[in-house]
Amino acid sequence: MKLVGWLRFTWEAKQLPSSSYLFQEEYSIRRATKHEKTQTWQVISSSFLLDTCWNDVVTRLLPQIRHDFEESFSHREIDCLVVTHGNRTIGASLIKPAPYVPNHLISGPCISDEYRNRGFGSLLLKESLLLVAKHAATNIFGVTRSTSPAARFVYPKFGGRSESYEMRLGDIALAQ
């Protein structure tokens, strides 16, 4: 059995690019609304359930993410971004915008399977980082499995630097 490690990525807020919304009309990226709660959770949970790099931890991980998800949706301003295609939620990123937390990207950018490899994950990551940076965080952190698609293809973007990280499942904030 191969042990799978964790990586913690760090981005400097002052080095982030500016926001850009280069979308076709039928796509949008914005904060989630309360009526999108069910679709948003479906995108996040299926992203973890369908990716084999999470198999050994998903039964402990999803309840923790769900707890933070429910907490976020109980507030007036929801700390979750969604990507929509028409009225369908195709991507979501649950964040914790407090300045001094060990992990800001609770779910990381989660994209529905059929919409992957189109740049939505990178765009969702960038907008998540910018949203956290607006809350006075100088360094922004995101944790993921070392074998995840996020670690290989998404998180190195926008100046993300990785380091090995010891993940206790009580510390939640991961990346798909």
What are these regions (language model features)?
Residues S28-Q42:
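A short beta-loop-alpha structural element at the N-terminal edge
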Residues I111, N117-L130, K134, F153-K157:
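Conserved acetyl-CoA-binding loop-helix of GNAT-fold acetyltransferases
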Residues C80-V82, R88-P97, N103-L105, C110:
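Conserved beta-strand in the GNAT
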Residues V132-T144:
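Conserved GNAT acetyl-CoA-binding A-motif
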Residues M1-E25, R168-G170:
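Acyl-donor-binding surface of acyltransferase catalytic domains
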Residues M1-K2, S122, S146-S164:
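Conserved active-site alpha-helix within GNAT-family acetyltransferase domains
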Residues G142-R152, R168-A173:
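Conserved beta-strand-loop-alpha-helix junction that forms the acyl-donor binding cleft
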Residues F48-D68:
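Conserved GNAT-fold acetyl-CoA-binding loop/helix
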